[in-house]
From Swiss-Prot:
This is CMP-5'-(3-aminopropyl)phosphonate hydroxylase. Its cofactor is FAD. InterPro entries: FAD/NAD-bd_sf. GO terms for biological process: antibiotic biosynthetic process. The lineage of its organism: Bacteria, Bacillati, Actinomycetota, Actinomycetes, Kitasatosporales. The gene is frbG. It comes from Streptomyces rubellomurinus (strain ATCC 31215).
Length: 437
């Protein structure tokens, strides 16, 4: 058993970004000298599931390359700017790149992080190891791992939980299951299944081409991103015949604009609480971007280009019961759920061995503005720090953002910069720096 200042559980975009953020801040040596262990269940760090997503990013290609500037670009990530992966991504600098292109670059970043950790005498990276349990205590936390050679444990002053998200596929109280009972033969897929399944690729000879009506449940980016993918297929003549695609949501989607003047010129209705004070952007964090934004603007009549025939939206602002959903989805052959994510977590125990119940005031884990998760019984979970898909931080004066946004901050750029700075401060606040091995 080895002791580290920080144990990072999960080596996807969020987990790796903790190390990248330290480099961006010019504090990598300070961070690593305290001792850092990275644990990743797969054999690859940095990109998570991103290489398998058949859709476009919601950030410009240039945003993913900003980590190559400044201290990180001359140190941890030196030379990556000349890689084939970076050059391909640079070709999308002013566009929204395909996520497999982003994933290839993030995999390179992950390789650099793993190499840096393995070369440092007080750090390590364990790939192919699964985090089973984290037991917290007043002085340290113990992390139980399962790997090729069995179980092993390490301890940390802080445990950073960045294990990705688990997609929600049901509505309370079991409304989707009840809908399927009312509509025998109705198929239900998650958005993740659609965007990772090769049978939804433009070149695929797929039975999905025969679909005539599809409903997408959810009004955030994942829902409109799936709808935008379907729109691309429809415009290419992929479907065997006319197809209707309806996004069912609780409210009209928030649209990102660079300024209030731009939003006003298009006739988009917004509130002062939707404007980020420091940047002046409308729906800076909560707004749709990329192909999802363009389709939503077309459906809402804000864009010059029209949406494909049959594409529309239904606002279902009351309870999402089976009866209400049945009316909203009409005669759909397929329902695609895009209902958000919950944080993927290991078993969490307190010092007394009892399971820790984290606070979830709005459904997602409450990590506040500083990444320190709250407990359902009150107070904070000792020794734990969290962020990432399903557990993002809420906006603060430090991160900026629109005051009216009640969601979570997610995305590679904010992981490496604004959120990364907040998380790094939480990890370095620990006063234990001696070698506890």
């Amino acid at each position: 058993m080895t002791h580290y200042a920080t144990v990072i559980c999960g080596g996807g975009p969020a987990g790796v970004s903790a190390v990248v953020a330290a480099a961006v801040q010019g504090r990598l040596e300070e961070f690593l000298d305290r001792g850092v262990l990275l644990v990743e269940a797969t054999g690859r760090a940095g990109s998570g599931s991103i290489p398998h997503y058949g859709i476009r990013a919601n950030s410009l290609g240039s945003a993913f390359l900003e980590c190559l500037d400044g201290p990180a670009g001359s140190g941890l990530l030196a030379g990556l700017a000349d890689s084939a992966e970076a050059r391909e991504l640079r070709g999308w600098a002013d566009e929204y790149p395909p996520l497999p292109v982003v994933g290839a670059f993030l995999t390179l970043v992950g390789e650099r992080v793993v190499d840096a950790l393995r070369r440092h005498p007080r750090c390590d990276a364990l790939l192919g190891h699964r985090v089973v349990e984290v037991r917290t205590g007043p002085e340290r936390a113990t992390v139980l791992l399962s790997g090729p050679d069995g179980e092993l444990s390490h301890t940390g002053d802080r445990v950073l939980l960045t294990m990705g998200g688990r997609e929600r596929t049901e509505l309370a109280p079991d409304a989707l299951a009840a809908l399927v009972e009312r509509r025998p033969g109705l198929r239900v897929l998650s958005s993740g299944e659609v965007i990772t399944d090769p049978s939804w690729h433009p070149d695929a000879a797929s039975p999905h081409r025969a679909l005539g009506s599809i409903a997408v449940l959810g009004g955030a980016h994942s829902a409109w991103a799936v709808a935008a993918h379907l729109a691309r297929l429809a415009r290419a003549g992929w479907f065997a015949g006319p197809v209707e695609v309806t996004v069912v949501e609780r409210r009209l989607p928030p649209i990102f604009y660079f300024s209030a003047a731009e939003a006003r010129a298009e006739g988009y209705r917004w509130d002062e609480a939707d404007v980020c004070g420091p940047s002046g952007r409308v729906h800076r964090f909560g707004g749709l971007r990329g192909p999802a934004r363009e389709l939503a603007r077309q459906v809402m009549g804000l864009a010059a280009e029209k949406a494909p025939d049959g594409f529309g939206q239904v606002v279902l602002d009351g309870p999402w019961t089976a009866e209400a959903l049945e009316a909203a989805v009409g005669d759909a052959d397929l329902v695609i759920t895009a209902l958000g994510y919950d944080a993927r977590l290991p078993r969490l125990l307190g010092a007394d061995g009892r399971e820790l119940e984290l606070a979830r005031p709005r459904g997602a884990v409450d990590t506040g503005r500083d990444g320190l998760p709250g407990l359902a019984a009150g107070g904070r979970a000792e020794r734990l720090v969290m962020y990432g898909l399903g557990a993002g931080l809420v906006p603060s004066e430090e991160t900026g953002g629109e005051p009216g946004y009640r969601g979570r901050l997610d995305g590679v750029w904010v992981y490496q910069h604004d959120i990364g700075a907040v998380i790094l401060r939480a990890l370095l606040a620990n006063d234990r720096t001696e070698d506890g091995r």
